[in-house]
């Protein structure tokens, strides 16, 4: 029926333990820089990857989850990189064992209605990253077995957004 088709399309695809494979790479640190705007938000990320020591085979691609993102730029160790865009993410082709990935994307939280990733509600920016919402913010290894230390910077027009509240400890505040 039409209703069951809609419901099945909204349901996430199940992931079974028997299909689990460890990630070829892990993440040491993640730095996020949000430039919040009325019509768009630019998210810049700097992610430090390293080879997972339990994975011994060589890797010719690394899949990063990403949905509803407009890719502006992508670099590995400051250089252009080969990649392949897909609807649900991108493949980095021939990634080094250890590298720094820099990605810049454009997102539109002002027009999101699914309440995942970064979205606006009553004029406030909000995030919902569990279970798979983070992939709507930037390209990332969005899986529960890959952990990282995060540093986040939020930039916004003070007149439009006088209060910026983030989960974590305040490191620095400026009035620019």
Regions picked out by a protein language model, each given a short descriptive name:
Residues 2-176:
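Acidic/His-enriched low-complexity segments
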């Amino acid at each position: 029926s039409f209703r069951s088709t809609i419901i099945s399309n909204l349901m996430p695809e199940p992931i079974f333990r028997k299909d689990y494979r460890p990630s070829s790479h892990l993440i040491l640190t993640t730095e996020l820089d949000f430039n919040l705007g009325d019509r768009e938000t630019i998210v810049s990320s700097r992610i430090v990857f390293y080879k997972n020591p339990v994975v011994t085979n060589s890797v010719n691609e690394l899949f990063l989850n990403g949905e509803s993102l407009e890719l502006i730029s992508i670099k590995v160790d400051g250089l252009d990189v080969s990649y392949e865009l897909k609807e649900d993410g991108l493949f980095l082709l021939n990634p080094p064992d250890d590298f720094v990935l820099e990605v810049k994307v454009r997102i539109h939280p002002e027009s999101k209605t699914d309440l995942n990733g970064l979205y606006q509600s009553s004029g406030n920016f909000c995030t919902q990253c569990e279970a798979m919402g983070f992939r709507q913010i930037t390209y990332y290894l969005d899986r529960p077995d890959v952990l990282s230390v995060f540093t986040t910077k939020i930039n916004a027009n003070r007149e439009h957004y006088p209060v910026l509240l983030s989960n974590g400890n305040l490191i620095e505040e400026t009035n620019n």
